């Protein structure tokens, strides 16, 4: 007996912003990737590092329309662990145009001098100040700092 089975190829759905195609990692992404914020309401947007290797620091520079959105709060993520003693976290704001600069550095511990994997860099609480559309974009100054090991 011979059995012949037919099947249809499954298309992958990348609705989850953390599902980054393998040829585009490492990556820094927003989650959720699209959000509607009602006027005078707030919404939390997370910034994630996806499939990074040997990272010791991150600079995420994010632009937005400050006529439409206001940043209410920025909280440290867990990429470098829950213990704030192992990391430094700085946030700077520039109002015109709306820019947030997040610097997040890993100080290391007895087990490791860098971090690999996927994790949250920060959570940003935005408030809708006016009706309109605002993009959130990473600038070209967004970068990963990698562990340097000198050749032996």
Task: Please give the residue ranges for each predicted region.
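Sec-dependent bacterial lipoprotein signal peptides
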Residues: 1-5
């Amino acid at each position: 007996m011979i059995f012949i089975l037919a099947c249809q190829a499954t298309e992958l759905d990348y609705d989850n912003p953390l599902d980054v195609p393998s040829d585009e990692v490492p990556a820094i992404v927003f989650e959720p990737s699209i959000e509607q914020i009602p006027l005078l309401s707030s919404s939390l947007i997370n910034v994630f590092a996806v499939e990074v290797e040997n990272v010791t620091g991150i600079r995420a520079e994010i632009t937005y329309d400050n006529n439409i959105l206001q940043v209410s709060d920025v909280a440290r993520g867990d990429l470098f662990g829950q213990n704030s003693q192992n990391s430094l976290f700085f946030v700077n704001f520039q109002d015109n145009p709306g820019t947030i600069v997040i610097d997040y550095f890993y100080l290391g511990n007895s087990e490791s001098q860098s971090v690999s994997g996927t994790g949250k860099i920060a959570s940003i609480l935005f408030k809708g100040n006016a009706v309109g559309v605002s993009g959130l974009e990473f600038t070209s100054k967004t970068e990963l700092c990698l562990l340097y090991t000198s050749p032996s």
